[in-house]
Amino acid sequence: MPTPHEAEKQITGPEEADRPPSMSSHDTASPAAPSRNPCCLCWCCCCSCSWNQERRRAWQASRESKLQPLPSCEVCATPSPEEVQSWAQSFDKLMHSPAGRSVFRAFLRTEYSEENMLFWLACEELKAEANQHVVDEKARLIYEDYVSILSPKEVSLDSRVREGINKKMQEPSAHTFDDAQLQIYTLMHRDSYPRFLSSPTYRALLLQGPSQSSSEA
C-alpha cells in the first residue's frame, strides 16, 4: 500500500528534480554553441597585434614618401675659382650659388645643423608654388618636419615666430614661413657662416681649383 507521500507523487507527477530538462523550440532548432577555441585568444593577442604593427609601418612609409618632394638635394656644376672666392665676400653670394649651397650644406651636416638649410630650401620651394592645394600640403609637411616640437629636425625659432606660424597655419599660404625662414637665414649667417669660411672644407676648395665637381647627396 503506497504511503501518503507516494500517493501524492502519483497524483501531482514527479518532483522538479526528477523531471528531465525541458527543451524549447529554439533549443531544438539550433545546435549547441561550439566550445571556445583556445586558438582564438592566441589570435587576438598575437595576430591582431602583428596586424596593427603592419598598419603602423605602412602609415610611416606613406608619410615618408610624402616628404620626398621637399627639396633635399641640389645637383650643380663645378664652381669656378672665382665663384668659390666670392663666397667669402658675403653670405648672400654663398646662398645664391647652387654650388655654394651644396658645399655649405655638407659643412652644416658635420655640425649636425643641416636641418637649417633643408628648412630654408623647403621655404624657397613653397614660395614658388602657385597651386593652393599643393601649398596646403607642403606647408603642413614643413610644419611637421621643421617647426613641430615633436620633430627630430626641429629648427630653432623664438616664441613670437612660432605663434605667428600657428595662426597662419589655419589658412596656409606660400609665405606662411617667411619670418621663420628669415630667422634661420640670420642664424646661419651669424653662427655657421664664419666657421665655414675658416673650415678645412672651404680652404681645400680655394686650393683645389675647378677639377672637383660639387653635388649634394
UniProtKB/Swiss-Prot annotation:
One of its GO terms (molecular function) is GTPase activity. It is a lipid-anchor. The keyword Transcription does not apply. One of its GO terms (biological process) is autophagy. PROSITE patterns: RGS. The keyword Phosphoprotein applies. Keywords: Autophagy, Lipoprotein, Membrane, Palmitate, Phosphoprotein, Signal transduction inhibitor. Signal peptide: none annotated. This is Regulator of G-protein signaling 19.
